Amino acid sequence: MKARMTALYAIGHFCIDLACAFFMFHCVRDSETWVTAALLYNFCAFALQMPLGLMADRLRRDRSFAVIGCVLVCLAALLRGSPLPLSILAGVGNAFYHVGGGVAVLHTYPERLGPLGLFVSPGAFGIFLGTLLGKGTLPMLPVCAVLLLMAGLLLVFAKGVRPPEMDMELRTAPLAAIGCLFLVVLLRSYLGFLFTFPWKTGAWAVIAACGVVLGKTAGGYVSDRIGMKQTALLSLGAAAILFLLSGNPICGILAIFFFNMSMPITLRAAADALPGLRGFSFGLLTFALCLGFLPAWSGLPAPSGGWFLALGAAVSLLLLLPGLGRKR
């Protein structure tokens, strides 16, 4: 039952991110308000997860949040002639789904990272595929139908585990460790916009997207086997070395794979640091994602070259280790 629930939430994550990317590129990309709409979407999709996560902690209705997310994104399709309202509604729906699904998996597997990595990983490929489809001629109706089907499946099959009552105070939280985790995610988000390798076209672009997905998945399951610190050392250390050779597509894809292995580690560590506020911890790190893409959207000049990505991976490791505290 737990495995089925996690698989459903993971598939839903793929569908919700695909739908949002599809709607944005199908309905908004060519409008005069594209830049504003994209900023509004990203703010709603990522920054709003923090207050929504706190709300989920209070209400303890994880599945309901995920279902609401599917419905809201579906309703956004009705606003195809209004780019800004569509972007806002799609972003809010995306935030609802991520909070609902993420917190449900955190509650269901309080000691494991593998299922968490499985949940977060499909979103990257959903965005990639949704962007491609959004630039084509696929009608919106099939996408909406899939979202409604997903909402129905979650209602029927994703029963989940009711979280235990726990302390929901911040005063006893290890704030320094949480701050380190926040900075790791912010840096990961920023560096992700610098993965503009000259070889990243055609089939190599598809393989690179798969590298993101598989890296996040592997990070969770490897951490369950050898521990979070060992996984962080191996993955980010390997990423730092391989980024120096990222002009070669094989080395670049391996670097992306290893770099993304830290994703479930940061989410699990933050949730463990705030055990009664898992929704808030999830949203706090997605707020860091939101801040991380602001430099790219603002048009600030970005450093180029594998050396900067290698430096970023090394700094991420130096921040992540104290963020993990005494965890093995």
Please place each PLM-identified region on the residue numbering.
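Intracellular juxtamembrane helix-capping segments at the cytosolic ends
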Residues: 94-110, 260-276
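Glycine-rich segments within core transmembrane alpha-helices of 12-TM secondary carriers
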Residues: 45, 111-134, 279-299
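Symmetry-related core transmembrane helices of the 12-TM Major Facilitator Superfamily/SLC fold
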Residues: 139-159, 305-325
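Conserved MFS/SLC helix-loop-helix module at the cytosolic interface between two early adjacent transmembrane helices
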Residues: 47-81
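Central cavity-lining transmembrane alpha-helices of secondary-active solute carriers
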Residues: 35-57, 206-219
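Cytoplasmic membrane-interface "Motif A"-like loop-to-helix N-cap segments
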Residues: 57-70, 224-237, 277
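C-terminal transmembrane helical hairpin of 12-TM major facilitator-type secondary transporters
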Residues: 229-266
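Helix-loop boundary and gating motifs at the non-cytosolic
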Residues: 1-42, 184-200, 297
